[in-house]
Design a protein with these regions (language model features):
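Bacterial N-terminal signal peptides that target proteins for export
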Residues: 1-10
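Bacterial N-terminal signal peptides
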Residues: 10-19
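Trp- and acidic/polar-enriched beta-sheet ligand-binding modules for extracellular glycan
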Residues: 24-45, 82-84, 107-115, 123-124, ...
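Short linear interaction motifs
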Residues: 54-64
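Predominantly extracellular/luminal regions of secreted and cell-surface proteins
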Residues: 63-98
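Contiguous beta-strand segments within globular domains
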Residues: 126-128
Length: 225
């Protein structure tokens, strides 16, 4: 390895370790405290096939820092869905605060492309969005897309927070994010302060079957004055 490559590697490592330290020392930010459900499975999945899967480390997610005053906005807020007659459960379960992974704690939507949408009641600045699709079994959900908007129909404006639909099979544009394995800590998406009243999450089946599931969605932020 030549000198330039060594210097670049050192700079990257320094940034990796110093960024969390800087966040901890920033008086305007605090660690997001989450109540996580009990893990339902242990170990690394071996039978999942995906051409766009992120590297599986098996390590827990590190701390995530948000502006001081950030709070949970989504608890018991109204939920709409592309499938208002779910196969199992009710869409209101998406924001009921219960993140357990067993039977009876998730809503099951029909096959193919589906979405759920949380109405926060007013425009908010968003600092973290978490989703639990189904974590009692290791699986990958396809075409996960997270969007934020002030338009309930998502036809005008809005912000795309996450998109791992690498081949545009959902028709909302190809994304550059990676697919991931569902685990009990859920998936945290960083909206980077995006503003909106509505949060919509898309999926398109999973590696076990063509159905779509949601245990819980949590949205953290602050109302816009």
């Amino acid at each position: 390895m030549d000198l330039n490559k060594k210097l670049l590697a050192c700079a990257l490592l320094a940034g990796f370790f110093l960024a969390p330290l800087a966040a901890r020392q920033d008086p305007t930010r605090e660690e997001l405290r989450l109540k996580l459900p009990k893990p339902m499975f242990i170990g690394t999945p071996t039978n999942i096939k995906s051409a766009n899967l992120e590297v599986i480390t098996g390590r827990p997610r590190g701390p995530f820092y948000v502006p001081v005053g950030t709070r949970l906005l989504s608890l018991d807020r109204p939920v709409r869905s592309s499938d208002m007659r779910p196969v199992i459960g009710d869409v209101d379960m998406v924001t009921d605060g219960d993140k357990q992974g067993g039977d009876g704690y998730f809503v099951e939507l029909g096959p193919g492309r589906q979405w759920v949408q949380v109405d926060l009641g007013r425009t908010c600045a968003l600092h973290a969005i978490l989703a639990w699709h189904y974590h009692s079994q290791a699986r990958v959900y396809r075409d996960v897309i997270v969007r934020v908007s002030d338009d309930k129909d998502f036809t005008r404006g809005g912000t795309q927070v996450f998109n791992n639909d690498h081949d545009n099979s959902s028709g909302l544009g190809a994304g550059k994010d990676k697919e991931y394995v569902e685990v009990a800590e859920g998936r945290l998406f960083d909206p980077k302060g995006a503003r909106g009243r509505y949060v919509r999450l898309h999926s398109n089946g999973n590696t076990t079957n063509d159905l779509n599931h949601y245990v819980e969605v949590e949205v953290y932020g602050t109302p816009v004055k």
